Amino acid sequence: NGYPHFSISLCAKIDDEIVSAVVIDPIRREEFSAFAGGGANLNNNKIRSSKQQSLIDAMLSFKKSKDKNYDFGKSHKELSNQNLNMRESGCISLDLAYVGAGRLDGVWGYDINILDIAAGALIAQEGGALTSNFLGDPKYINGNNIVVSTAKIYKSLLKSIKPYFKG
């Protein structure tokens, strides 16, 4: 449909830890990168996640799921009732990098493939965002769900999503 929101993502994993990552947006000529413990960059300039403190004022993105273990419909309705600013871009790897750069304040997804999130998640973490699975465990790497956001809204976002997860 001519919607130019996609990326190329690569990462290196040692044991169960992502140690380096790159997410490339070829349309905008942007390269997000990170090394574990080394911060995150956009086109070789340091980036940081936003300082957003309120979930109601946050810009959020999500990945829809039809999996029976997560009631996406009820979750989305609950968050919509809070009048949150939400969107689905269709490219979770780029959305995660956007959290690291402060363009988005939070992202969550269920029924995802680790290959779609590993690089972007490290960039978000190294940019200062918090990352976990839907149960709040920071070891999201072995699961199929993720919550990433700025530190100040993380607990509120997780609390809004968690009741609809049956895992």
Feature annotation, model-predicted:
Residues 48-167:
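An extended, acidic
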Residues 31, 44-45, 51:
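A short, polar/proline- and glycine-enriched secondary-structure boundary/capping micro-motif
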